[in-house]
UniProtKB/Swiss-Prot annotation:
N-acetylserine PTM positions: 2
Function per UniProt: Essential protein, it is the only enzyme in yeast capable of synthesizing thiamine pyrophosphate (TPP).
Substrates-to-products reaction catalysed: thiamine + ATP = thiamine diphosphate + AMP + H(+)
Family: Belongs to the thiamine pyrophosphokinase family.
Species name: Saccharomyces cerevisiae (strain ATCC 204508 / S288c)
Designated name of the protein: Thiamine pyrophosphokinase
Lineage: Eukaryota, Fungi, Dikarya, Ascomycota, Saccharomycotina
Induction pattern: Expression requires the positive regulatory factors THI2 and THI3. Incompletely repressed by exogenous thiamine pyrophosphokinase.
A single GO cellular-component term on record: cytoplasm
Pathway: Cofactor biosynthesis; thiamine diphosphate biosynthesis; thiamine diphosphate from thiamine: step 1/1
Amino acid sequence: MSEECIENPERIKIGTDLINIRNKMNLKELIHPNEDENSTLLILNQKIDIPRPLFYKIWKLHDLKVCADGAANRLYDYLDDDETLRIKYLPNYIIGDLDSLSEKVYKYYRKNKVTIIKQTTQYSTDFTKCVNLISLHFNSPEFRSLISNKDNLQSNHGIELEKGIHTLYNTMTESLVFSKVTPISLLALGGIGGRFDQTVHSITQLYTLSENASYFKLCYMTPTDLIFLIKKNGTLIEYDPQFRNTCIGNCGLLPIGEATLVKETRGLKWDVKNWPTSVVTGRVSSSNRFVGDNCCFIDTKDDIILNVEIFVDKLIDFL
């Protein structure tokens, strides 16, 4: 079949009755989790660079808050020296090898009973340590019992110092039925836009979690974008028209993992059919945008990354 590229008007209606929809997602729920899901705000070790009112709202919308090692410094500094404010925004966990956590910040959060877990292994990243921890928190009563036992406080909460989190996680997954696990909405601040190798690693986690822990719904939020994975073989992205009109700009369909075929899109300014896309060839759908009145359909041969431009100063009114 020959490839096509169709330029659409700025607003079109999308009929979904004849579309083969394998997956559905709501754009706003990447930031405002569904109440039927477990949810986590993960702060990675980059400057927090979104408006404070938006940060406070996002914080309150998530069940669990986790700082990856030096990200605790970022949170501490973001709240300046306002102690009455800082005490309201204590993370549930700080985890990592703690090499980048300042002594002052460590003492502050330890004094305020934040659970701080040291993991010294250099064979996994702080991101992976955080993800294993988050899964254990929601899915392992044994882990929660360890954490709540005050007798374990002085011994790293009873968790082996090198890679205890990974050991506990691997043991848990031996009996975990993924299809019965409550989904975990995971919104990550940071991880994109700092050191390039760390940015690439962050992108790999979208693929890794989709393959190995599919109950996670990971999205990265930056001051300019939401970045997430679109599953292959037909995904419908739903959104409120006013939310789209006010908070959303351009988008890009990015074949970062591998070259693939966009079998069909419906609801983009430039829709395509049977369209090969590849970073190597330079055929990438960038600077596109949603024009479907309340949804967009994307059908690809393989999983693909989507970035969606956001206007962070407008988001607060829709959360």
